[in-house]
A protein has these predicted regions:
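A generic structural signal for tightly packed, nonpolar segments enriched in small/aliphatic residues
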Residues: 1-131
Length: 131
């Protein structure tokens, strides 16, 4: 069992990866490898990004369990993924794909003519078929 979520979560991932790759954040190396491999096979590019306890300080709060914004600045996409990870229970293998740069295409390409790209459908379908 594992969880994979896709979201147009942050504009920060666009600063990091542009419209060429989705950002992959995961607590599980095996699941990450499956996603990276599937992405290559279906031509939906994925780049693994850091997820580490050292980023927790950016969303810790003195007034609540946590805060959903990093007031210090920087590491926006990683901070958002750290926030999501806090809702994953019992060390369940989990991956988050930040697809903000991939969900829409101004110019189109080999697999679409512009507009909504459907990014992730082929990737998730391949992973599901292999289960």
């Amino acid at each position: 069992k594992f969880i994979v979520d896709l979201a147009t979560l942050t504009g920060a991932i666009i600063v990091s990866l542009g419209s060429e790759y989705a950002g992959l954040f995961s607590n599980d190396d095996k699941l990450s490898s499956q996603i990276l491999e599937a992405g290559k096979k279906v031509e939906e590019k994925v780049w693994r990004m850091p997820l580490h306890k050292n980023f927790d300080k950016l969303i810790n709060s003195k007034n609540a369990d946590m805060q959903n914004i990093n007031y210090v600045g920087g590491a926006g996409s990683t901070t958002a993924a750290q926030f999501l990870q806090r809702f994953i229970l019992n060390k369940t293998p989990w991956a988050h794909l930040d697809i903000a740069g991939m969900a829409f295409s101004k110019y189109g390409g080999a697999l679409n003519s512009g507009g909504a790209t459907g990014y992730g459908v082929r990737l998730l379908s391949l992973i599901a078929v292999k289960q």
